[in-house]
């Protein structure tokens, strides 16, 4: 009994920590026909220090992590290599701030439809893990659907 218990304890101690990130309220801004880009927004909370390092979606040829920042009194959007997610703090990706940019869109983003997005995170040890989410498209000019509803929780998977 002692050997199997010790073996179990060692196996647990040696297992890599799973950097859990909770994704809440993911949504994508709707587009007009032939529009080539839009943003995806959500709230991210990591249990341990992590970083959002990339994202992918079948609806876009290019997906980048962006920030809005003031440069010479002008608000500019630019790509960033990663978004730090300090443990226990909620990072809001929102219009006018950090967001996931979907570019070279393959189709119009129509209100009420769902966009699959794969978020790629890295934990503090450099281990990458992914999380599949479904973000609902909010039509242009529409009030955000679900803004007053309970938040949806989605969890990631290590690869």
Model feature map: region roles:
Residues 1-9:
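Bacterial N-terminal signal peptides that target proteins for export
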Residues 20-159:
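Compact, glycine-rich, soluble single-domain proteins
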